């Protein structure tokens, strides 16, 4: 996995998404970023969820005191302003992962994007500016369908969808994937693969999932 010294980095973008919370999305994002970093990859982790669980799990105890977050960065893009210096927002975690944090300002994301041209591409515009600095960029998305989720879908190269192995959860995932394909069919971007991760498998669930 590790890139050769001096070689161009892959900049592969992975979106960890589900429109339902409590399915292991944040755990998947933080654990995978740690494992990739442990293998020698240079990894960035973007907390794109207003609940800011990823930010807290990475050791930020007071997210509301952060002066620059992913929301502020995207606001600069919308306003056509110069992006903040990387050192003002990037947090190097104990695991060697570069965290781009979130706080409750992200709850205003949909309002920020209202009446914005090409609103679905704003996250991609930012990620493209850092892509060649990393082997992998992981995005922990919001657990709801909306402009923020669409931004992640368009931005990423691959999706990882944590899902519980129970009937209703699988049916919900199927609906999510149908929505995803509709969005991608109208977007000028392609996701190379979709990955489904079964989480919280119940021993009592004896039904096969096909």
Regions found by a protein language model. Give the residues of each.
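P-loop NTP-binding core
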Residues: 1-210
């Amino acid at each position: 996995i590790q890139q050769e010294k001096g070689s161009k980095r892959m900049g592969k973008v992975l979106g960890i998404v589900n429109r339902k919370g409590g399915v292991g999305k944040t755990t998947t994002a933080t654990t995978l970023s740690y494992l990739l970093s442990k293998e020698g990859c240079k990894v960035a982790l973007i907390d794109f969820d207003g609940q800011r669980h990823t930010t807290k799990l990475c050791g930020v105890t007071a997210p509301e005191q952060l002066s620059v977050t992913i929301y502020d960065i995207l606001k600069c893009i919308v306003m056509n302003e110069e992006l903040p210096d990387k050192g003002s927002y990037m947090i190097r975690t104990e695991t060697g992962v570069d965290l781009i944090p979130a706080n409750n300002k992200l709850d205003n994301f949909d309002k920020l994007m209202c009446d914005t041209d090409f609103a679905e591409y704003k996250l991609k515009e930012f990620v493209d500016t850092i892509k060649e600095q990393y082997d992998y960029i992981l995005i922990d998305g919001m657990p709801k369908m909306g402009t923020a989720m669409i931004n992640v879908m368009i931005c990423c190269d691959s999706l990882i969808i944590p899902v519980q192995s129970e009937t209703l959860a699988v049916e919900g995932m199927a609906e999510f994937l149908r929505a995803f394909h509709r969005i991608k069919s109208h977007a000028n971007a392609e996701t190379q693969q979709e990955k489904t991760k079964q989480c919280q498998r119940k021993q009592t669930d004896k039904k096969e999932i096909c």
